[in-house]
Amino acid sequence: GMMHACGHDAHAVIGLGVAEVLMKIKDSLHGTVKLIFQPGEEGAKGARPIVAHGHLDDVDYFVGTHIAPTKGPDDGDVTPGTWGSLATSKYDVYFYGQSAHAGGFPENGRSAIVAAANAVVNLTAIPRHSGGISRVNVGVIRGGTGRDVIPDQCMMQIEVRGETTEINSYMDEQAKRICHAAADMVGCRLEMVPEGSSESQHSDE
């Protein structure tokens, strides 16, 4: 009875509806029409492979749409020139420390969870950008094997967003700096694996 309904079901229906209409009038069309259903949209990993595989090499015009949560299902409005989607960068962040017995030899340990916790607190403290919308989120954090073991590994899934590509770059740089500093503070090794990114877009007509 629950779903992540941010529009993908509606977008698929819109695309199929457009395909049905175009097939009915195909004899009056001149040129080629491509319908693109972007894979991996939630992780911002789908558009680049489409471009890299040449699917857009011969495309002259690109028309896209996105449903709006502010409109009801019966409004039937189409609004051009809306503000664009946020640019984003997404990372899997890995902290590697040193395991030790928390009761017997804590001085021998370097807690990956402590490093991650420092990162979480300070990521949320990144000053928001005065030039537009900026966002940061830690959506997943996992680590540790037992209450008496100083954990040698911890991972986080994080993302930053910005109203413009420049604002997102600001958030991205701050997030990287904070994660590296959090690891250094505890003596951990850090690995940040990019898991998707996209630039901002604005519709002007």
Residue ranges and their predicted role:
Residues 4-5, 106, 165-170:
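Ordered, soluble secondary-structure elements with a strong preference for glycine-centered loop motifs
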Residues 11-15:
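Alpha-helical transmembrane segments that form the membrane-embedded catalytic/substrate-binding core
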Residues 17-30:
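Flexible, small-residue-rich helix->loop connector segments that border functional cores
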Residues 113-205:
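Metal-dependent amide/peptide-bond hydrolase catalytic core
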